[in-house]
Amino acid sequence: MKKLLKHPWIIISAVTAITVFFALQLKSIEIQNTMRLFMPQKGDSYIRLHKTEDQFGSMILLGISLETTQEESVITPENISIIQKITEECEKLDLIEDVDSLTNVDFIYGREGSLNTGDLLGGDDYTGSANDMNLIRQKIIDWQDMYHNVILSDDGKITQIMLTVNPASSSTQQVELLKEIRAIVEEASKGSDLTVRLYGDPVQSDEMRRMMMQDLLCLIPLVILVVIVTLYISFHSLAGTFLPLLTVLISTIWSVGLMALLKVTFTLIASVIPVALIACGSAYGIHIISHYYEALSLSKGEMTKEKHLDVIMSALKNVSAAVLLAGITTIAGFVSLVTSPLVPLQSFAAFTALGVGFALLLSVTLIPAILYLTPLNKIGNAKKASSKFALKVKNKVKNKLEKHGLISKDEGQDTPYNIYKFFAGTPCRITLLILAILIVSAVGIKKLVIDTAMINYFPENSRFRKDVDFVDENLTGTNSLFFLVTGQENGDLTKPEILKSVEGLQQYLEKKNPEIGKIVSFTTFIKRINQVMHVPALKADTETFSDSDDAFFDSLDFGDESGSFESFASDDSFESFASDEDFEDAGFSSFAESSDIENSENSAEGHSAAAFVDPNIAFAEKLNEKMSVAEFFQLLQKAYVAAGGRRASVENIVKEMEKSFNFNGIDYYEIPYNVEKYPVASREELSDLVSQYLLLYSGTLDKFADNQLSPKQIRIQVQIKDQSTLVTGKIIEDAKQYAAKYFPEGYTIEATGNAEMQYTMAHMVVTSQMTSIAFSILMVFVILSISFKSPWAGIIGALPLIFTIMLNFMVMGFANIHLDLITSIIASVAIGIGIDYTIHFLETYKAERALSSRLNEVTKNTFRISGQGIITNALAVGLGFAVLLLSKFIILRCVGILVAIVMFTSSSLALTVIPGILNTLKPKFMNPKVKPVQKTEQTDGQPADRT
């Protein structure tokens, strides 16, 4: 090393070349924050997601909501024209697989006994007239299970367009796609009163990218400023201020540049790397500079190049072991996160550890090289300044504390020691302190919530968060969860038994989980097809009511197409299981009573298809008959009772009236299950009926069935109005429990989609957190055991770190800060940095123990030598991370707060728990090999020179 330092320009040139090389790589770094990127690609959740997309299409959704602010309804000719233009232009985009909107979504209807598929506008018959607007609204009402709060909101003022994005598209491509979509929407809606909101995974990723760039441009200069101020206060010299800073800036460029070179994606958690390196990595340079000034102050005579080199080498020799040990332990703390299955945590751990290693390397090479180039005539000034350094800083700190009344004039330097004596100075006190930590931590940890929803990263007042909250409140929700129901053979999913169970599952989930906004599946289409195929035939030219009643019934608008599409029912008119009585019990039984199935099966025995009488013949006759006012009120009263009496809603009353006549086929909006209602002899033939429906259906079911004619697997789409992974987890568990109890044998259910991935990530965060903590604590134990040649050293050194982690989780629990992908790094930071304080104290205590057998004296001297340094370093690191409080992201603000707290607790515990245990247990590894030579006390109260 000495020979190398004689040629400092070799070191400086090499470092400069490497820095320029990595700096040039920074421009190619890719910023991305998609859920798919975070998950392990070999994990079950990720593999299932991709298999599902290969079969059913992409699950990357991008929503556009349009809200009218002046009209009573968004359904106007002008707005429909805007929606149609946006739809058509978006369909032309290469990365868009599908577009669903008010103008192109499928509408299933029956005409003259045939099954037809069209759109809500009516195809070529659409003219934009007021009558057309009414027909569109009536069609939306006609199929509530499909369109309610999807195509049109409850108040009629909001509609949405759903775009399906190609899952193979990169983050860069999605950013460009989003720009194109924004331009299309802006151009189409220009001059209208429509308020536009965009949401979905691509929008979230782009918003995170934008906010990250703002953070990096703001926070890095701030943390640099904090470090500069801290270093200048410490050294009062340019070398002492800028050399440690230079090493961490270069190490940051190397670390992030290497990420870009290796094509590692820069995520939100990676944005903490520069802050962490600048805040933590400067410690090594500070050690080098401090010992350099100390060695310089001890040098005698005229300074020469050779003597200056000896001073530098002396400083390196004195500090190299301590710096190396501190660096290794810090690296070990960060490396522990590599055990996580989550990709962003792995990359954060790897490149932060590399950055720390780079900072360590540069501290022992670049700083000495630059110091060696210092002109000899300026070294004297540095020497003079360094001789006054310790006393000046000490007096300033003491004067400040005395000024504010925090200490008396006699005890300023003993404050950390006095704090130790108060909390852990006796065996009783250290025991009570540990018990208090355990009890308080246990209470707080019980309150800790594990939730990995990425929406929580955004402030509530951010535009994206407001848009998502608006859609969750007014439409079906932005959180998409999917279930896959799989049989054993092709055609298994046409059997009435499983279709009935799937329908029951949907109703059960909706009732038990109010956060669900909508469930759509294969059964939704089967029920609709069954309905339109059983609409009673009407005589268009027959007067339905007596002349005396014409005026009364004219006020009831049944539409202009003989009742084929319209009814005067409201939102729940066409739900076959909507009455309150159906949901008396929140358990499974109210949705799938086995007795109901048995009764239905028993009633099917002996049933003959030849003896079947089509009830629609009677329904058609009733619908074509004249009705008196008295008969109408009898019908109304009957419907009122059937709908629940005093608890009845208008919607349910109308529904019961419609069912009495099978109006618009409403009595057949069901899974064909009851054999007596159909011209079949067995339930197996009902399966054939479903297959015939699929054959007749001219639309596509690719999103919901793997095979349109004989499906083996179907997909259920669940839209959730809440982003919490706790809600998602409950829905998934409810579905699995229901399926286990009520699905026929041979059928399975699995969850997938982005919501399921976030839920799975929550479990991974917990397991990776426990693994990384165990790994890092083990590393601490091994390092300390080897360093002090005793396993007791490992145990004692690990205890304050364990307590620090427990207190961190306690604070998170009480402060309602969720444990998620980002906050899971705190424990590793606590161990990686906190171990430095432990080692520093143990090393000094052991050195003092070799000089004295009086434990109080040893402890007090240890505090005098190491206490202030530990506190200062903790303060510097805490302030460095505290700049995260100015982040655009809520979660990074939490990280800033937590790291600051962790620095306080880890340093405090190192200065209380460790000396308390050492003085109570008196472990043998602290005993000196040679009996210490006692000192004589000087009159000034300072220890005499060591002998």
What are the roles of these predicted feature ranges?
Residues 1-33, 368-369, 373, 377-454, ...:
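Signature of alpha-helical transmembrane segments and their immediate interfacial
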Residues 5-6, 213-266, 339-343, 771-817, ...:
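Interfacial segments of transmembrane alpha-helices in multi-pass membrane proteins
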Residues 13, 278-292, 320-339, 344-401, ...:
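Transmembrane alpha-helices and their membrane-interface boundaries in multi-pass membrane transporters
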Residues 26-74, 80-81, 128-151, 166, ...:
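Solvent-exposed, non-transmembrane loop/terminal regulatory segments of multi-pass membrane proteins
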Residues 47, 54, 92, 97-237, 249, 679-780, ...:
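Extracytoplasmic
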Residues 216, 245, 284, 297-340, ...:
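Pore- and gate-forming transmembrane helices of large, multi-pass membrane proteins
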Residues 405, 412, 418-422, 426-561, ...:
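Juxtamembrane segments of multi-pass membrane proteins
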